[in-house]
Amino acid sequence: MANAASGMAVDDECKLKFLELKAKRTYRFIIYKIDEKKKMVVVEKVGEPVLNYDDFAASLPANECRYAIFDYDFVTEENCQKSKIFFIAWSPDTSRVRSKMIYASSKDRFKRELDGIQVELQATDPTEVGLDVIRGRAN
């Protein structure tokens, strides 16, 4: 079903990969992009569980918008192992205005398709999605 505001549908693979990340911890991260020709949000890349934050950050293009899911593992002050699922709306200042508008207008509907997001971040440059920011928002 297409999103009335932006006309973007969501590929079934987007939900399937997210469920695998959430339930089976099959991936560390998922990068999604909008395929303007297909008018659809699609999976661009998945990161294996052995990958880390630096691998994730390197997967975000410098000049193009993306949506991303990052499964962040951490240890609490009480020494408990936890994880939080982050949704990141990546919209760099250097990306095209049209692209920013399409991603912004499609974001809420896309997020509703992914049940289990715990923290949302909006980022326009790498510092806004740095590991220190993720660590701070996870607690």
Curated annotation (Swiss-Prot):
ADF-H domain boundaries: 7-139
Molecular function in Gene Ontology: actin filament binding
Gene3D superfamilies, alphabetized: Severin (3.40.20.10)
Gene Ontology CC, one term: actin cytoskeleton
Translocase as UniProt keyword: no
Keywords, ordered alphabetically: Actin-binding
Protein name: Actin-depolymerizing factor 7
Gene name per UniProt: ADF7
